[in-house]
Amino acid sequence: MKYLCIALLSLVVFSSFAQTGTSRTAMVKGKVRKEGGEGVSFATIRLNKTDIAVLSDAEGFFELKNIPFGEYEVLVTSLEIQPKSFGIVVNRRLHELSVDVLPQSGIDLDEVKVTGKTEKKEIETKGFAVAVIETKEASLRNLNTNELLDRTVGVRVRQNGGVGSRVEYNLNGMSGSAVGLFLDGIELSTYGSSFNLNNIPPAMIERIEVYKGVLPAHLSGDYVGGAINVVLKKDASQNNVTVAASYGSFNTFQSDLSGSYRNMKNGFTTRVSGFYTYTDNSYTTWGKFSKFVHANRTLERYYRAKRFNDTYKSLGGRFEVGFTNVKWADLFFLGYNISDTYSEIPHGTTMARPYVGRFAEYDAHVFTLNYNKNNFLVKGMALNVNAVRSYRGTFVQDTVGQMYNWDGNPRMLIRNGVEIPVPPIAGMGQQGPKSITDINRRITNMRTNLAYTIASGHRISLNHKMETTDRDDNDLLKPVNKDLVTTSNIMNNIIAANYESQILNNKLRTNLMAKYTINRTIQTKPEIITEGDVTIIKRNKNRTVNNNRGYGATVSYNVIPLLYIIGSTENSYVVATEAQLYGDPDNNILENPGLVPEKNINYNIGFRYGAVNIGKHKLTLYGSTFWRNGFNKISLRAVENQIVQGRESDGDIEFTKYINLGKTQSRGFEGEIIYIYDNKLNALFNFSKFNSLFKQEYDEKGKPHDLYDLQLPNEPFFTINGSVQYRLNNVFQKSSILNIYYNAGYVAPFSTVWMASEWFTTPTQFYHDIGSSYRLPNGKMVVSLDLKNALNAEIYDNFGVQKPGRSISVKLNYTISKFL
């Protein structure tokens, strides 16, 4: 890391000298806002009598770049405001403006039609199968990032219970290591279990990009199912501090804080954010997977019980210091993330048996470096470097031997006509042998992207990703010296090249990608052996090396105004992660170092139409279909044998591991409709339907495979989401805003085991959420109220684990702007 910093700083200094002779240009940035401070989204800011223009973002912020020094007239227009013009003298490298405007009393039919693309539209029409989630409204409500993702077309968030439980993301049948999770372009796993999508509040997020299939250049990696990239807020044009706190059912308290400061003269910038979450997760379960074992060994299903031993507490902070929009860098930041989490483990893979006294603790210290420069060394060249070094610790304790029931009391048996607690088995904990496991990880992750525009509409880029993970596993109940510690090392190197083009008046956009990956794993397990009278330490090494090539392409064609045909294809590999190879005891995952890379051949084709404006009405349509062929799919192992009546407990597993399935095939389609009326009513409807089938026709003995053509278990394959939002202005107070929300979700029944079984099929899930938010006239305070799962429906997820029923919460948001 030290050498990386020195090298990059040298590069930065060199680039600053290399550009001293360039022409004098500036940036004009700021915010268009109405009375009360509310930002005006998608307003046009134009320098009159020039071709320089830009749209403000969803919060009213804008940036005009590369403006030659001189005098200009600025014209600001939008359908919802009265046009405004004013003069400006550009005589320094950065000008920051606050443009106050008046609301439009009526629509002027002679107003010039403004065309342009928002960041969301720009990403969604590049040819990738991608959806962009904007978080402006969600940040004001008591919603977490995973809930936003779960409402997105084609995305299913798989969670093993309540807040803080293990999460896996399914993108139209692809999950696990096939799906990448990124935070500002860096793998989220680098930051540790404490800093995950459960804990990062929407208030800290600018947008979420959900890719299905081929990934853009800056996210190159061993992923074939797609990726989720969380882009944190970076704007520092206005010094501000935002705080939020919420309290709700199950004794759940959440709070977050974020702030930014920028020195307008020299570009010095600081950003700070943090969060705290606490919950008892004490919700009630009552469905078919909730069971009680009586003293006479009879099993009672549909047992109503309140969850226990499920406390979750997490605290984290992110600190960054650097420079923005200066001569030698568009962005340069050094950062530090710290997080700490305590999480009780209430049960194993399924809910069959509750645990008491089994818990995990996590800590992470993460150091980051980000550098970004457009027109680096020469005009048209861009350099982006992200580097992370993290130190992560995981502590798992399981030392209680007593078995428990879901009423919170010890499991009983009848002996000599008397009910007594089931005697603990010597040396056994809740899930297996008693243990106190301490896992330490040291992770280095560096991504470099160098892009060059060789001609208008033609761009090439070269990307390199290097990631290493060193892991040490210790059992503190059986302490040994450092020579007997199990060590694991993983190194991934990926080189990727991309060519992007925009031709035919920018109607046709293509992206060609090729990559080469080198993956190496080494695990050393020492053991003490005696040969004659001599005791020695034997080091058993398991080493693997594999090299893989991949390629892909995307295309987007603007057939007619507002209609885009989008397609992509990819042939690539994905390798197992460190947790899949070497286990994850806090998540009930066993090791399987024999996993081999998974190969996938994917095809996607779809369209996006809109937004079509008809008077006060806006309509956007999206549809896509996909076909995915997988080989050696890396998947969680599920029960394969037929569940026999009277032996349903055979399907109750407390732990599992990742395995390689044979050939698989996933085909399906998805669609979405978005309707907006008068910028007050917003309605959304989306669905996803696919069949993910096992296609290995014969087993290793050449006999017909029992699982051939069966649906892969534990995967919801048909989901529907719908939501409605309505805005009311000037309610109770002038210039206030009241938003009312409604959301509904549907999940079709799916099996948690391979062979059909009534007892291991989740029922139909249909749930409703309602909520509201009230923004005070000064625009600084927002109060929101949310009622989730309002009808107290049964909701299930991974391996039939029941999720919370009805819950209510209230949230306060407060923003302090322009404090310096």
Label the model's feature ranges.
Residues 573, 630-638, 740-767, 772-820:
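C-terminal beta-signal and adjacent terminal beta-strands/loops
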Residues 322-325, 330-340, 362-533, 546-552, ...:
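Face-selective signature of the C-terminal outer-membrane beta-barrel domain
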Residues 65, 186-213:
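Short acidic/polar hinge/loop motifs at secondary-structure boundaries
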Residues 504, 517-519, 525, 620, ...:
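Gram-negative outer-membrane beta-barrel transporters
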Residues 130, 146-187:
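Extracytoplasmic beta-strand/coil segments of soluble accessory domains associated
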Residues 566-570, 598-659, 665:
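Membrane-embedded beta-barrel scaffold of Gram-negative outer-membrane proteins
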Residues 33-35, 44-46, 77-81, 91-139:
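Short, acidic, small-residue-rich periplasmic hinge/interaction motif at the N-terminus
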Residues 96-100, 145-148, 165-170, 182, ...:
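N-terminal periplasmic accessory domains that precede
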